[in-house]
């Protein structure tokens, strides 16, 4: 089942308003919603038969770097945008999968990405064949807050 254009627009808006270091907004998105594009993407990643995928890229030309050590925050910025899109997709009744196991060189080649763009992750989105999992599962599937805290 295709994802409705209105829902795609809401998901993209969630990425657009995501915060970024120094508000430089280095995240760039490649939206794939057709069979040809999904076939190209499947050469680099398992997209789980999703009807929609978003390649989340970081434009290194717009990177903010921490002065103390030069750490670029583009991966972080792209990840924040991805998380915002996932939460929006969930709120719209969609399922999503954050994919990091892919070949970035194949993605860059297949989609003609500019030299300064690095594909950070792929977000596959669609209607799940399975019912949504209960948030109650976090009580057993996630570490307790006490383990999460490094110092307390």
What is each PLM-predicted segment?
Residues 1-6:
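A short beta-loop-alpha structural element at the N-terminal edge
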């Amino acid at each position: 089942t295709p994802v409705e254009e209105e829902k795609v627009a809401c998901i993209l808006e969630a990425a657009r308003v995501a915060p970024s270091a120094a508000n430089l907004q280095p995240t760039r998105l490649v939206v794939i919603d057709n069979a040809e594009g999904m076939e190209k993407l499947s050469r680099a990643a398992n997209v789980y038969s999703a009807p929609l995928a978003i390649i989340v890229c970081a434009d290194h030309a717009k990177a903010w770097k921490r002065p103390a050590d030069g750490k670029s925050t583009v991966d972080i910025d792209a990840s924040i945008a991805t998380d915002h899109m996932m939460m929006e997709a969930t709120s719209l009744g969609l399922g999503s999968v954050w994919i990091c196991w892919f070949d970035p060189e194949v993605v860059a080649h297949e989609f003609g990405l500019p030299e300064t763009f690095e594909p950070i992750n792929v977000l596959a989105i669609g209607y799940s064949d399975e019912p949504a999992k209960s948030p109650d599962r976090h009580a057993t599937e996630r570490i307790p807050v006490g383990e999460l805290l490094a110092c307390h």
